[in-house]
Amino acid sequence: MEFSVEGTQFSPPVKRIFDTAGTHDFQKSLTMYRLQSHLERYLKLVQGQKIPKSSQNRAVVRFVCILERLDALMDETPPRTGSARRFGDLACRDWHDRMQGELDGLLETLLPEAARRSAAELRYYLGSAFGSRERLDYGTGHELAFLAVVVALDMLGLWTEDKFTGEDMLYVWARYYALVHRLILTYNLEPAGSHGVWGLDDHLHLAYILGASQWAQDRNVPMQPSDILDPKAVARYSETNLYCNSIAFLLRVKTGHFAQHSPMLHDIAQTVPTWSKVTTGLIKMYRVEVLNKFPVVQHFWFGTGFFPWVDMAHGMSLPNYEAPSETSEKPAAGTAHTTTTTMPPPRMTANCGYGPLGRLVTPRR
């Protein structure tokens, strides 16, 4: 489905997912189609590529300058001394306030004049990509918001002002994860919606998919999934591969044996023989545990431009639910976590240039 800036109305995103019914509708939305089809293309783009040290793409350089400014804000907003908390230094709220105050100006440096109307939506997704100001946490929902930013800028044609390569894509994500890692460490951010040791990672998921995809079709792959259990091998490739980069961060912040604090990643290393199978399994898991989980997607809001609340098949608005009243009966604890069915791959239109994601297999836990 083609996207035209001139023919698109943009508006500040609003909340549409209030319960599991909204989560179900999300699976058949145009937004879901756009997120998944673009992600599919990005995974193909990064195959056989390494994270570079820099980029020659002018839009990528401008965007990374935004991330660098947000990184500099941490230097200007140090953690508060004498405010001992198990999770979440309160200075993080000051950082969020300063970040929100600068977003409009930063986006103006990024967007061409013709696309600046889209800033009404872009500022929401970019502002949501660095954790929660209220809860002082970071998780896969915030990582999803950053995917939305990358997709939205792609839809604007920003990345393709110059030649855009898989290395450029990896550079954008690597700089984002470097900023996120520093936020987590500086402000001691809590994992958002963590499954504890039975989750893939306290904070991330897409990083592992992108990193596994880098090596999925490489006949001369420098290491196999089982080699992840070797910390020296992980360190060797942590600057060029996002999977190793994420494992290296885990090893930095976790204590104890890898099999104890990250049993799912340990199990993947022991039982999944190829990076191609790791990639397909992690995509399957992402659909179930992120895109189809109410606690995660309830924080993904919808505008009228990039990610509308519209049915993919018919182009009609999806049901608009309202927030439950204070007096309404609340669902029993755990109700929102029981949905585990996945959405089938979206049907691709003939002229969109994207193929289906295909049937995928979850790695054995």
UniProtKB/Swiss-Prot annotation:
Q: Name one GO biological process term.
A: G1/S transition of mitotic cell cycle
The enzyme's main class, written as a single word, is: isomerase
EC number(s) for this protein?
5.2.1.8
Domain of life the protein comes from: Eukaryota
What reaction does this catalyse?
[protein]-peptidylproline (omega=180) = [protein]-peptidylproline (omega=0)
GO cellular component terms, A-Z: chromatin; cytoplasm; nucleus; protein phosphatase type 2A complex
The record, for CDD domains, names:
PTPA
Compositional bias (Low complexity): 331-342
In the record, what terms sit under GO molecular function? peptidyl-prolyl cis-trans isomerase activity; protein tyrosine phosphatase activator activity
Question: What's the chief localization of this chain?
Answer: cytoplasm
Region (Disordered) residue ranges read 321-349
Family membership noted in the UniProt record: Belongs to the PTPA-type PPIase family.
Protein name per Swiss-Prot or TrEMBL: Serine/threonine-protein phosphatase 2A activator 1
Q: Which species?
A: Eremothecium gossypii (strain ATCC 10895 / CBS 109.51 / FGSC 9923 / NRRL Y-1056) (Yeast)
